[in-house]
Amino acid sequence: MSDTYQVGEIVQAEYKTGKYVGKIVEWNPNGSKAAVQVLAVLNHPMQGNLHHPMNPDVSYFHQRRALANQEIALMPLETLQAYSGPIPEYEASLKEALRADIEALTKSIRFSEKCLSELHALQKEYFPEQA
């Protein structure tokens, strides 16, 4: 992390569990956060309860939306990094971030199902008397 950011600088920053490209609109080097205007979504926020990750059986399963185009959010300074690549168009970046999450979760489901199948087969092999 650099401690010499300037207003107007383009950065990559994290807010809760999402990652964004944005423009610094307010910077206080003595503070703990910078006001960043969202320009693109790099990673969509994770769904569910942050205190119990990967657990669907919680009392409240949070639906987390990405920050909106041009929304200004206070982002922790330790998450800021200089960004020098092309800035994706907001809607296209949101669509891609959402697609990537859906694909990763779908692969995870398929992998888990295959693992369970193999573990059940091994269980029958290890303990045939219990099958």
What residues fall within each predicted segment?
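Short beta-strand-centered aromatic/proline hotspots
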Residues: K19-P29
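Ordered hydrophobic segments in well-structured contexts
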Residues: I10-Q12, V21-K23, A35, S59-Y60
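Charge/polar-rich, low-complexity and marginally structured segments
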Residues: P56-A131
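Cytosolic, membrane-proximal regulatory domains of ion/volume homeostasis and mechanosensation machinery
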Residues: N43-M46, L50-H62
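Short coil-to-beta transition motif at edge beta-strands of beta-rich domains
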Residues: M1-Y15
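Short, solvent-exposed secondary-structure boundary/capping segments
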Residues: G31-L39
